[in-house]
Amino acid sequence: MRTPPSTPAPEPEPAPVPVRARTGARLRAGDSVPVRTLDPVVGPPLVVPDSGRVVHVQFRRFAGCPVCNLHLRSVARRHEEIERAGIREVVFFHSPAEELREHVAHLPFAVVADPRKELYTAFGVEAHRRSLLDPRGWPGIVRGVCGGVVELLRGRGRLPAADQPGGRTGLPADFLIAPDGRITAAKYGEHVYDQWSVDELLALAAGPGPTDG
């Protein structure tokens, strides 16, 4: 009598690996990002993730963007409070460093130029007409333009360049990155002024766990 062939033992399942940033795809809380050394337009190089504190990464539009400036002024006013909460601010613009520097040199946190949008792509940050067409963003646009005029009259502001190779329809995005590289919170804006407020940022950094939105 012929002995039936034995059934081979199933191969063990591979061990799970950490989720890494997916190029061009939206990132979620729980994903992780690789270590990168960045060169701000003012100040020394910095490393993200930061081994000693949480990093708040913001993606904005172009140098001199009135809506971006409106929001960043609110961040600058409370920067000491943000730092006391153990949060480091890092802001990206898609303008060249030379152009960006004259607009942001006064800010108390790191600002990084990414004219090729390499980090925008890595974090899945998009541009779309709805950034300007969504009525929810219009109050921010009006306040940003009016605030920009006041800054110009005071001799502290600068007009943005007429030509914007990176476009004018970028959508904002916010990420909280833990020291181990995990994203603990992420938000992709639905219009030009859809980002975390400082109060929301502080609450998320002190919160119990990962969140999207």
Walk through the language-model features, giving the residues of each.
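N-terminal "domain-start" segment that seeds a small globular fold
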Residues: R2-V48, S74
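Conserved beta-strand and immediately adjacent loop positions that scaffold enzyme active sites
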Residues: V35, V55, A173
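Short active-site neighborhood of thiol/selenol oxidoreductases, capturing the structured segment around
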Residues: V47-A76, E89-F92
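Residue-level preference for short coil/turn positions at secondary-structure junctions
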Residues: S51-G52, A85, G170
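Structural microenvironment flanking redox-active thiols in thiol-disulfide oxidoreductases
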Residues: H71-A122
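Thiol/selenol-based redox catalytic cores and closely related redox-interacting motifs
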Residues: D114-Y193
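A short, polar/charged loop-to-alpha-helix boundary motif
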Residues: V192-G207
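Cysteine/selenocysteine-centered motifs that mediate thiol-based redox chemistry or coordinate metal-sulfur cofactors
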Residues: T211-G213
